[in-house]
């Protein structure tokens, strides 16, 4: 079992295992079963994107812009290397660079025997890593509290940044950032504008924006006493899915065949499914400059539909629609 393998390699002591919840009942929709029906495919694609996407506030969906560096802590040897390689390989399949060590991890995966306790300690030690201070860069205090206290087998937290595509600079004020002299002249105070981002608006449009949403760092905490009998391949693919996109941890995905259902029904999927790959490909292939979340969701759904409309359907699983 993977849990035994990881606990043996970890630097922490194991605890009593926690039972997994019962799998959700009902038929499962496979992407391969709906590609022959254009309207059904488009509707299902939009429903899947709506369910799993977790953008910050009213901002668009974030993604990694150029590359990722994957770090794995509290695991040793082949287990850690496999997970790092798997996440990096999926990133490369999406057109990103998968940096090799030594590099500063932008995706940090930590295994522990007590996910909640470790999350609390990490947040208390470096709160600025989770809430850096710039507007619209994280899901906020309520979501962070859920991340801290969750009893999930795997929990994750992402920080994103609105970025000016012309300059590559943050489009929001960062904590401690100053673009002016930053030194109060005699008798006067430093202008408040010195602490605001300086961007030049090159166009005004209700449909498009010159700003994109970049993922900057993602923390993934694996509670090894809660992962049950999942395989290393399943765990690696699950982590890749939640680390390379902003995924809603409370998404209701029971009607879809997706790796996100792993801990509800471990035997149902062996790795990234058609839906998972289609979502990631749609996210990274769709145009970044759309203003509204709705238009971005539709763009990703359309990308999924266009990509898979001509695919040949596989044999349906028992009970699938």
Residue ranges and their predicted role:
Residues 40-64:
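Compositionally biased P/S/T/G-rich terminal and signal peptide-adjacent segments
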Residues 18-19, 60, 64, 100:
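A domain-level signal for the mature, folded cores of soluble proteins
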Residues 2-12:
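Sec-dependent N-terminal signal peptides
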Residues 71-86, 91, 95-317:
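Long, folded non-catalytic interaction modules
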């Amino acid at each position: 079992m993977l849990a035994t393998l990881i606990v043996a390699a970890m630097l922490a002591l194991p605890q009593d295992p926690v039972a997994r919840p019962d799998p959700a009942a009902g038929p499962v929709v496979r992407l391969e079963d709906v590609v022959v029906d254009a309207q059904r495919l488009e509707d299902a694609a939009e429903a899947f994107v709506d369910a799993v996407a977790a953008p910050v506030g009213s901002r668009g969906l974030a993604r990694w812009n150029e590359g990722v560096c994957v770090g794995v802590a509290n695991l040793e040897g082949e287990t850690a290397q496999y997970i790092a390689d798997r996440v990096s390989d999926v990133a490369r399949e999406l057109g990103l660079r998968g940096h090799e060590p030594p590099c500063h991890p932008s995706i940090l995966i930590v295994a522990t025997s007590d996910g909640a306790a470790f999350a609390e300690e990490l947040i208390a030690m470096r709160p600025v890593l989770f809430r850096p201070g710039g507007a619209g860069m994280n899901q906020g205090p309520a979501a962070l509290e859920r991340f801290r206290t969750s009893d999930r087998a795997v929990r994750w937290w992402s920080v994103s940044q609105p970025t000016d595509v012309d300059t590559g600079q943050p489009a929001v004020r960062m904590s401690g950032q100053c673009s002016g002299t930053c030194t109060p002249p005699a008798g006067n105070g430093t202008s408040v504008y010195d602490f605001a981002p300086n961007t030049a608006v090159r166009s005004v449009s209700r449909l498009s924006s010159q700003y994109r949403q970049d993922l900057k760092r993602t923390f993934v905490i694996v509670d090894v006493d809660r992962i049950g009998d999942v395989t290393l391949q399943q765990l690696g693919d699950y982590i890749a899915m939640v680390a390379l996109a902003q995924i809603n941890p409370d998404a209701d995905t029971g009607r879809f065949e997706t790796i996100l259902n792993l801990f509800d029904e471990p035997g149902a999927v062996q790795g990234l499914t058609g839906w998972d790959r289609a979502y990631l490909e749609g996210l990274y292939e769709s145009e970044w400059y759309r203003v509204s979340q709705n238009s971005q969701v539709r763009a990703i759904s359309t990308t999924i539909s266009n990509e898979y409309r001509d695919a040949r359907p596989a044999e349906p699983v028992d009970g699938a629609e």
